[in-house]
Swiss-Prot record:
Pfam families per record: Ribosomal_L10 (PF00466)
Species this chain originates from: Geobacillus sp. (strain WCH70)
PANTHER family xrefs: 39S RIBOSOMAL PROTEIN L10, MITOCHONDRIAL
Protein name: Large ribosomal subunit protein uL10
Record carries keyword Ligase: no
Gene that specifies this protein: rplJ
Length: 166
């Protein structure tokens, strides 16, 4: 019997570590999804570097107490799955929101963003943000704009001087 207790303690420690290490965590109710749909969701999340796991609610509540996120205890009723992302803050919210639009059975319950409990509204707002790559490309275009404008002005001045000398 003690080996079962030790195994449960290891699982609680694993869950707590995942909550600590992840930049973004989203909790969903997956009740009503069939195996093919869950497999498709797992595939999309895995491609984005997001880990999607199902744990017993009692073990998850103990891990939440260990991490200091007891405010999420009310969320853990019924079948739940947790999406952990160590890299991209936006990825789990974006993928799960897009999937929930196509599959009404998937319900986003709450989340944790960089150690702070996030409401459903905050998760939805996060899902509407562009991806990290999209934000970087926007930043790059903003940084390139002055240089591009300077180059165009310099070319226009050179063309004008060329016309005057001709």
């Amino acid at each position: 019997m003690s080996s079962a207790i030790e195994l449960k303690k290891q699982i609680v420690a694993e869950i707590a570590e995942k909550f600590r290490a992840s930049k973004s965590t989203v909790i969903v109710d997956y009740r009503g999804l069939n195996v093919a749909e869950v497999t498709e969701l797992r595939k999309r999340l895995r491609e984005a570097g997001v880990e999607f796991k199902v744990y017993k609610n009692t073990l998850t509540r103990r891990a939440l107490a260990e991490v200091g996120l007891e405010g999420l205890n009310d969320v853990f009723t019924g079948p739940n799955a947790i999406a952990f992302s160590k890299e991209d803050v936006v990825a789990p919210a974006k993928i799960l929101s897009e999937f929930a639009k196509d599959h009404e059975a998937l319900e986003i319950k709450a989340g944790v963003i960089e150690g702070n409990i996030a409401t459903l509204e905050e998760i939805n707002a996060l899902a509407k943000l562009p991806s990290r790559e999209g934000l970087l490309s926007m930043l790059l275009s903003v940084l390139q704009a002055p240089i591009r404008n300077f180059a165009l002005v310099a070319k226009a001045v050179a063309d004008k001087k060329e016309e005057q000398s001709a």
